[in-house]
């Protein structure tokens, strides 16, 4: 009986792909070695312990329909588009060894004519006339009896968009959690013009088979063709939820301030698990009562633009004579946390 399993995703949905990865990892036999190949449409993928409001320009992501996906491994934030090929190697212990999977990826690149080297803990680099450039980054996860190594290969990614989404607005966040390290990167098309996702997948697959001396047929999966994965619906629901992608952020504080024609406003938020645990409001407005009332209402509110806007606008019923000021405030607060 073969010990290998090869899965290739036809879906570009990051939540689907990460849910498949999680389910396979949980239910695979400890004697199995798995290779999962996939790619995501426009997505910022953050590490398990990261703060999306600190790492990402969440406002621009919303404007451009870029998804946020939190993975179950550690490490930093990365931008995925269809110019990235993603790979996941899984194995039970003691078989699991990330140096083996790194060797397989290096062998695949070598078969395509690219000489790359492992650098540090997570990266693969190539030599270019401009110096060493990163073409692959990885992250890892281990449990008591198994582990996985997943990463990306930059084929023809739109590198200009990295800065669009991974450089956040200069919000006044005093955040805990893991900050991403920006790296000098390059696409493999710089060395191999015309290289495709399919060619890279084939090369990685052949290197995987060669290392283990076995071959298996690929299982092609999509939302219409999912293998029998226990608890997949629940895992996908969690992976795609606001509570997981945003609400799992480490605790942080956010200071907002603005001057309106009717007065200056300062808001101080403490946020834990995506909820405001403490809110302070300061103002020099001649009519401070609505803002004083707002502080209490914000306690426990989801740190989400639509919920904050609703909370501010709900005060209009109590303070109708200040409707215009409250609508202006609501619009500003919602925009500031997007």
Swiss-Prot record:
Database matches in InterPro entries: aa-tRNA-synth_II/BPL/LPL, BPL_LPL_catalytic, Lipoate_ligase_A, Lipoate_protein_ligase_C, LipoylTrfase_LipoateP_Ligase
HAMAP family from the UniProt entry: LplA
Quaternary data: Monomer.
Name the record gives this protein: Lipoate-protein ligase A
Location in the cell: Cytoplasm
Gene Ontology BP annotations: protein modification process
Keyword Amino-acid biosynthesis part of the UniProt annotation: no
Higher taxonomy: Bacteria, Pseudomonadati, Pseudomonadota, Gammaproteobacteria, Enterobacterales
SUPFAM superfamilies documented for this protein: Class II aaRS and biotin synthetases, SufE/NifU
Pfam family, any one: Lip_prot_lig_C
């Amino acid at each position: 009986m073969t010990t290998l399993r090869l899965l290739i995703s036809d879906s570009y949905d990051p939540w689907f792909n990460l849910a498949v990865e999680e389910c396979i990892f949980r239910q695979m036999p400890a004697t199995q070695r798995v290779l999962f190949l996939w790619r995501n449409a426009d997505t910022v993928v953050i590490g398990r312990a990261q703060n999306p409001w600190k790492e990402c320009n969440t406002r621009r992501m919303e404007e451009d329909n870029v998804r946020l996906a939190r993975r179950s491994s550690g490490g930093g934030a990365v931008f995925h588009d269809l110019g990235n090929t993603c790979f996941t190697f899984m194995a039970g212990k003691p078989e699991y060894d990330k140096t083996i999977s790194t060797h397989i990826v290096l062998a695949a690149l070598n078969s395509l004519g690219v000489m790359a080297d492992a650098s540090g803990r997570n990266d693969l680099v190539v030599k270019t006339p401009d110096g060493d450039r990163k073409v692959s980054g990885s992250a890892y996860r281990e449990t008591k009896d198994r582990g996985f190594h997943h990463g990306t290969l930059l084929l023809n990614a739109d590198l200009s968009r990295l800065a669009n989404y991974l450089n956040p607005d200069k919000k006044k966040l005093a955040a805990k959690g893991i900050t991403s390290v920006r790296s000098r990167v390059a696409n493999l098309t710089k060395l191999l013009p015309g290289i495709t996702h399919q060619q890279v997948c084939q090369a990685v697959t052949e290197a995987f088979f060669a290392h283990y001396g076995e071959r298996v047929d690929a299982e092609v999966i999509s939302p219409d063709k999912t293998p029998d994965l226990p608890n997949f619906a629940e895992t996908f629901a969690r992976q795609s939820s606001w509570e997981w992608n945003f609400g799992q952020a480490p605790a942080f504080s956010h200071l907002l301030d603005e001057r309106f024609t009717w007065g200056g406003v300062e808001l101080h938020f403490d946020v834990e698990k995506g909820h405001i645990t403490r809110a302070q409001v300061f103002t020099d407005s001649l009519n401070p009562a609505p803002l004083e009332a707002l502080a209490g209402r914000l306690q426990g509110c989801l740190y989400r633009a639509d919920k904050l806007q609703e909370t501010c606008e709900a005060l209009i019923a109590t303070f109708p004579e200040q409707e215009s000021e409250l609508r202006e405030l609501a619009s500003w607060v919602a925009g500031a946390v997007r």
